[in-house]
Amino acid sequence: MTTLLKDRLAADAIQRIADVLAAIQPNFAHDDFIQQAHTGLQQLELKQRVHHLIATLSLHLSEDFPQAAHVLQQVPAYWPTHNEQGDYGFAAWPLIDYVAVHGLKHPELSLQTLKTLTPLFTAEFAIRPFLHLHFDVTYGYLQAWAKDENPHVRRLASEGCRPRLPWGQRVPSLMTRPDVIIAVLEQLKDDDSDYVRRSVANNLNDISKDYPETVVSLAHQWLAKPTAHRQAIIKHATRGLVKSGHADALAMLGYSQTFNLQNISFTLNKTEISMDETVQLSLSFLLREPQNLVIDYALHLPRANGKKSVKVFKWKTGLLMAGQHELTQNYSFKVITTRRYYVGEHDFEVLVNGQSLGVRTIELI
């Protein structure tokens, strides 16, 4: 059975937080913290649990933030990385975001504390309020962290300044000034950690949604001295542009907006579906010659306000040989933490090199 993300902030995480803080601070009210942390937790969703645990921590850590920060900076020395159920990373989330809630009047100390804590989970969410209220100071830290020896800290330099960070607070200065972000990413484009380079790619993908030509131009600059790592970054960074059929991005990656598919058939195996069921998409076509193709499918799904949003999924990418091709893909209407479904018409659209080849509709009942 799949574990919900919110359940990773439950009894085991609360116990870990209490044990570690009690080891650092012998007068920490271990049992009281556990009892208070559990009170009202069950009905809360993931981010609500984070806020609830921060509020509980505030009852037990010093009201004087420098003293609380001194305790938090010692946490990594006592923090185990794994248990039988998996990693303890999520348990550190409330400890990290505590800094964002209580440390905004102490930006220098808070940023130093976040650097210490980010290897436990990630401080990418906690850093956003500091970028919003203390941009110049925080940006200086990002520039320095991009040169840090710890890959978790270097990743924070990139992930923390993503303009469209999922779940992260929006920072207007990042949305309107891609140049300041790119100055950080320039230091990380040849990083030896895939973990860091993937963050660089995701950051550029964010930027491309508002400044596509800026990202394409930067990609050409980076590929002037091509390496396998840079090529992988650019491929991942331009995935949004490829899905949207951006001609320059497609050409740069070796895909053309002119392609020749014959005898195209795109079908769904049902016209109605219930929640938690699966629909199968089938696509068949004939190629007379080998072609470089990016085949995606888009789901146009209704939201709570009645309007539709679009989510694009990868299907098949690469050089396809001449001949008949039969592709199938299953899509589950199972509710997950990051996606909810509403009854009504859902449209599946097949995209080849960013161009629509057809739409099929299914009714969620």
Locations of the language-model features?
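Contiguous beta-strand segments within globular domains
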Residues: 261-267, 271-286
